[in-house]
Design a protein with these regions (language model features):
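Non-catalytic accessory segments flanking enzyme active sites
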Residues: 7-90
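Gly/Ala-rich beta-loop-alpha elbow adjacent to hydrolase catalytic centers
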Residues: 184-188, 192
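Cap/lid segment of the alpha/beta-hydrolase catalytic domain
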Residues: 93-94, 98-174, 183
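Residue in the alpha/beta-hydrolase core beta-strand immediately N-terminal to the catalytic nucleophile
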Residues: 179-181
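Short alpha-helical segments and helix-capping/turn motifs at coil-helix boundaries
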Residues: 68, 81-85, 106-112, 189-190
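Acidic, low-complexity proline/glycine-rich segments
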Residues: 1-6
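C-terminal His-loop and adjacent cap/lid subdomain of alpha/beta-hydrolase
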Residues: 92, 194
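Conserved hydrolase catalytic core segment
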Residues: 197-201
Length: 201
């Protein structure tokens, strides 16, 4: 049966409503627990050992940007590994960064990259199927086998990986960690939403 009004996020389990800013953190945790139970499943905590190595770098767009391939590792014995493609302005200082989960074989177009650079932003993309298949086989992929015992599906797995991209950005000297965005297309949009629910950065 369809609902005609969106649920009230400020309605607490006891029937009262959040009235102050101080009450919100507890309500947020309640909502996250509901989403974990009914929608996303359980997922492992941040591994704490995320690292990134630049394996390729060159100037692009007539020298006004730098393109890099970044190999990210994390998890027990660095069992989780995947590659990202980064475009960033070739200038000193910190810049906002867009993190973009992509489908296999898809990357930002030159027009999209040019628009990002014109705003002074960086963009870092990764193909999410490196971590989990876009099918029922996700439960047999690299993340699921590295972290057994969790009830997550592909959406949560990809979202967890998008947060590991943010872990890497935090180790760089160019990412403005107060201006990080998660995005994706179609199911990728659901992934970005999941990532931002569980990662407050």
């Amino acid at each position: 049966k369809a609902i005609h009004e969106l649920p009230d996020p400020f309605l607490k389990p006891d029937g009262t409503r959040v009235q102050t800013r101080e009450e919100w953190p507890e309500q947020r945790e309640y909502l996250k627990a509901m989403l974990t139970h009914y929608l996303y499943g359980t997922m492992p905590p941040p591994p704490g050992n995320t690292r990134g190595k630049v394996t390729f770098s060159r100037k692009v767009y007539n020298g006004r940007a730098i393109a890099e391939t970044v190999h990210i590792t994390c998890g027990p014995k660095d069992a989780v590994q995947f590659d990202c493609e980064l475009i960033r302005p070739a200038k000193e200082g910190k810049v906002p960064v867009i993190t973009w989960n992509q489908f296999k074989g898809r990357h930002g177009s030159p027009d999209e990259e040019d628009a990002v650079l014109n705003h002074g932003y960086a963009i870092i993309e990764f193909e999410k199927e490196q971590l989990a298949a876009d099918s029922a086989d996700a439960i047999h992929g690299p993340l699921a086998t590295t972290y057994p015992g969790y009830t997550w599906g592909a959406i949560a797995m990809w979202a967890w990986a998008q947060s590991r991209v943010v872990d890497y950005l935090a180790t760089t000297d160019y990412a403005d960690m107060n201006r990080i965005v998660a995005t994706g297309h179609s199911r990728g949009g659901k992934v970005a939403l999941c990532a931002t629910i569980y990662d407050e950065r």
